[in-house]
């Protein structure tokens, strides 16, 4: 059994361990889960990920309780079929999906995965990011399936839903992304739920000015019926070899202009950098590339989160990661056996 210290990371460290355990069949025990957070231990959204992993892996689990700082997870085998999980809060649906999808894909399983909760959460990849940036690359690596969103879920109400219909396909294959190629599309979309339309107009005015977008490169999506008040601004930049999605979230006492400025600056920084993958997508590519046993991509300065995830992956899989500084803000991340 692999012994893990969860003090250095948050819930993502646990979710990555669950995903790796399912993929490899290796049991693990983690202590100190979220020990340095204001509310230590497992919260409801983490428990949903544990329950999803337990169901998919037919696993024996000890310590899956609210507030628990230790967990023991022993997978027995991968089970496809139809699964549905409800987080019950605005906790991220996409993080639960990413916990169980790699193992089902790797083991050639088929099934339907539906998760209810938050789809646009400031602390997690949005449903738009998964659909437009992450999954297209996974399909190039061999993933076969369809993603859909049955409803938007914003913090704090939640109420959203995502579904992934998985078909048995090829195991993960190597992907190399040294360059992004020419940018061929830019689009900004303001998403509103029970929020005045003027908020979207103010956000998009900033994006148009910052990024030089035309009228045909902006849109507004009003969620009907609304599941609760919420607002997100999603900027998509599609290039020849990769797509980046940058998101700003409307929150209390933060102006629409400030939300749009932050997302626009992130998009501008990526456009100015000579890299294929933005920082957030870089975090998401480590596990699937490790499962393929080979891969590489160029990105900006790797986050501490990416490095800690790479170190965790190396505990479960016979791979090594290399982070190479190529100068001028460009890094090359490589994984090999």
How would you label these PLM feature ranges?
Residues 1-26:
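N-terminal basic/disordered segments at the start of proteins
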Residues 24-41, 110-113, 149:
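Glycine-rich phosphate/pyrophosphate-binding loops
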Residues 47-64, 68-146, 163:
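A generic, well-ordered mixed alpha/beta core segment in the N-terminal half of proteins
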Residues 60-64, 110-111, 144-152, 211-228, ...:
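Flexible, glycine/charged-enriched surface loops at secondary-structure junctions
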Residues 74, 78-80, 86-90, 106, ...:
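Phosphate/diphosphate-binding glycine-rich loops and adjacent basic-rich segments that engage nucleotide
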Residues 122-125, 149-163, 221-230:
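Beta-rich nucleic-acid/ligand-interaction surfaces
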Residues 123, 140, 179-279, 296:
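Conserved mixed alpha/beta catalytic, RNA-binding, or beta-rich assembly cores of soluble enzyme
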Residues 298-337:
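C-terminal functional modules
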């Amino acid at each position: 059994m692999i012994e893990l210290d969860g003090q250095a990371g948050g819930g993502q460290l646990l979710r990555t361990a669950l995903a790796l355990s399912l993929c490899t069949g290796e049991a693990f025990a983690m202590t100190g889960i979220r020990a340095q957070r204001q509310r230590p231990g497992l919260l409801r959204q983490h428990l949903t990920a544990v329950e999803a992993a337990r169901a998919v892996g037919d696993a024996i689990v000890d310590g899956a309780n609210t507030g628990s700082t230790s967990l023991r997870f022993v997978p027995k085998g991968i089970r496809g079929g139809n699964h549905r999980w409800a987080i019950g809060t605005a906790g991220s649906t996409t993080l639960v999906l990413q916990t169980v999808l790699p193992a089902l894909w790797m083991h050639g399983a088929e099934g339907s995965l539906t998760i209810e909760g938050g789809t646009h959460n400031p602390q997690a990849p949005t449903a738009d990011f998964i659909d437009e940036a992450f999954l297209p690359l996974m399909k190039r690596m061999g993933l076969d399936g369809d993603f859909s969103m049955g409803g938007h879920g914003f913090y704090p109400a939640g109420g959203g839903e995502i579904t992934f219909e998985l078909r048995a396909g090829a195991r993960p294959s190597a992907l190399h992304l040294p360059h992004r190629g020419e940018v061929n599309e830019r689009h900004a979309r303001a998403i509103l739920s029970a929020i005045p339309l003027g908020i979207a107009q103010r956000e998009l005015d900033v994006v148009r000015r910052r990024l030089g977008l035309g009228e045909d490169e902006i849109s507004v999506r009003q969620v009907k019926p609304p599941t609760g008040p919420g607002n997100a601004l999603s900027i998509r930049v599609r290039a020849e070899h990769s797509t980046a999605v940058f998101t700003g979230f409307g929150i209390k006492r933060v102006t629409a202009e400030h939300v749009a400025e932050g997302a626009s600056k992130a998009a501008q920084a990526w456009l100015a950098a000579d890299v294929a993958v933005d920082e957030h997508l870089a975090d998401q590519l480590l596990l699937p590339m490790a499962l393929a046993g080979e891969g590489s991509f160029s990105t900006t300065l790797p986050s501490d989160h990416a490095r800690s995830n790479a170190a965790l992956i190396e505990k479960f899989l016979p791979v090594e990661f290399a982070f190479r500084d190529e100068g001028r803000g460009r890094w090359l991340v490589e994984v090999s056996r």
